């Protein structure tokens, strides 16, 4: 604990540490790692919710301090906002992580050259590639480049952004086919057994098969929304294929066109269950062949000379869901003032993508030993708590936002405070502290209310399971035994009379 306005607090703030409230006091509990050459890395606040990821965080920090320079990656996202600073984007959390761990280079749509010093290109929902860039990317791969495509037959993020349902991108299917990957852009994959329960217009909860959980090759739980499916094409002897993620063995699909204006209830009715596994993420490695028979940009000064075949091993990975990277599919909470180490994930989507980029770039970063569990692994108490929290979700979000705003205001005031400040400034800080304390108490009261509601549900569940249900079954058993015995006695009496 640090006393307010003390030299220790000023030092913590100047180092970039962020406080978090504990009862009515503020704690500064961060971590700064300093390398021998003077370079440093900072975790502004060690959040208890991220304790399972601490080993991974420290490993990445130490690995980064040992690197002479960051690995350079390129981001190509012509249709979805994905700025490296992570602002104003549905992918803000992933953008912040990429900015922290790599040197991020944004690739313009009209680029005629993808520099070979870019270790990995991340193409997010590229759609129909501009002809010039398509050639540049092709020649980048011919020279041993690595590309990660996030494609989508029905991007819900793009739907929300443009205001109308998107159409499938058949062009990407043709582009990827030349590199040995069959992308089924016209159909959306689903999994009923791992699907999420959603509330319909009639108030009833149903399993929506197009929103589901899957597991990666390392067992990490991954969340998908309306993904496509992939298949390794035949007759590509120079390529090695690896399945990175797939549905279970009892999956199905639906035509992408059918879900554009349909309700979730109608989608459930039209869904085709065929009990076949579908690959959701696929990696192809080896020597690829070019899409082109000649150099279409030979006269351009910036373009690479044409190569018909790859001169060294390259890699192309495809994830058939661009929404896979969006915050909504893997972020439980996020602290805007701590954009990297304030992210609390509930799914392994970002860890999957970071691990894939590390794998392709040759970065030997050890994956986290502990990954978030899928909701299906939650126990009864957690499930009841989530149901109670859902009823008070809007109220809790309001209190969360209010408490975060008052905490941010208080930190700004403290950070700008100097020894020469007058009494009125200190009183302003005291008022901000009192306001923040009231907001925290209101938030704590609401959390206690949620917990109490969950306890009541749990008590009712226990009463039903261990008292009412067993008593009912016991009563039914005795009643059945009584009527069976009486029937047998009547039959015996009837037989005696007949004798």
Please place each PLM-identified region on the residue numbering.
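Extracellular ligand-binding/catalytic regions of CAZymes and related secreted enzymes
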Residues: 59-70, 250-499
């Amino acid at each position: 604990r640090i006393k307010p306005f003390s030299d220790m607090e000023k030092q913590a703030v100047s180092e970039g540490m962020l406080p978090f409230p504990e009862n009515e006091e503020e704690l500064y509990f961060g971590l700064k790692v300093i390398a021998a050459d003077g370079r440093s890395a900072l975790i502004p606040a060690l959040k208890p919710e991220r304790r399972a990821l601490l080993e991974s965080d420290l490993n990445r920090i130490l690995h980064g301090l040992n690197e002479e320079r960051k690995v350079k990656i390129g981001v190509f996202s012509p249709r979805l906002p994905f700025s490296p600073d992570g602002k104003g984007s549905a992918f803000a959390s992933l953008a912040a992580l990429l900015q922290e761990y790599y040197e991020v280079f944004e690739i313009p749509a009209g680029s005629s050259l993808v520099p070979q010093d870019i270790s990995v290109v991340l193409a997010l929902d590229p759609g129909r590639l501009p002809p010039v860039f398509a050639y540049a990317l092709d020649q980048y791969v011919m020279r041993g480049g690595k590309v990660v495509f996030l494609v989508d037959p029905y991007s819900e993020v793009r739907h929300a952004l443009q205001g109308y349902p998107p159409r499938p991108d058949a062009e990407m299917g043709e582009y990827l086919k030349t590199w040995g990957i069959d992308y089924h852009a016209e159909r959306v994959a689903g999994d009923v057994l791992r699907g999420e329960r959603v509330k319909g217009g009639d108030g009833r909860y149903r399993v929506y098969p197009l929103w589901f959980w899957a597991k990666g090759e390392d067992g990490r739980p991954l969340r998908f929304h309306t993904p496509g499916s992939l298949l390794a094409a035949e007759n590509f002897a120079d390529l090695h294929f690896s399945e990175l993620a797939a549905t279970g063995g009892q999956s199905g699909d639906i035509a992408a066109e059918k879900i554009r204006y349909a309700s979730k209830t109608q989608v459930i009715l039209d869904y085709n269950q065929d009990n076949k596994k579908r690959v959701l993420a696929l990696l192809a490695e080896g020597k690829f062949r070019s899409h082109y028979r000649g150099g279409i940009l030979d006269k351009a000064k910036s373009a690479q000379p044409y190569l018909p075949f790859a001169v060294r091993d390259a890699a192309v990975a495809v994830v058939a869901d661009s929404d896979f990277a969006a915050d909504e599919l893997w972020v439980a909470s996020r602290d805007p003032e701590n954009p990297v180490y304030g992210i609390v994930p509930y799914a392994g989507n970002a860890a999957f993508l970071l691990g894939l980029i590390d794998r392709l770039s040759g970065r030997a970063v050890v994956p986290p030993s502990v990954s978030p569990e899928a909701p299906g692994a939650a126990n009864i108490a957690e499930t009841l708590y989530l149901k109670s929290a859902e009823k008070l979700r809007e109220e809790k979000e309001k209190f969360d936002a209010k408490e975060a705003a008052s905490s941010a205001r208080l930190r700004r005031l403290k950070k700008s405070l100097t020894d020469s400040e007058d009494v009125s400034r200190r009183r302003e800080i005291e008022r901000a502290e009192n306001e923040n304390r009231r907001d925290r108490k209101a938030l704590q009261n609401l959390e206690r209310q949620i917990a109490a509601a969950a306890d009541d549900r749990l008590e009712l569940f226990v009463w039903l399971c261990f008292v009412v249900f067993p008593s009912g079954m016991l009563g039914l058993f005795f009643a059945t035994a009584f009527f069976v015995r009486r029937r047998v006695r009547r039959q015996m009496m009837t037989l005696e009379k007949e004798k």
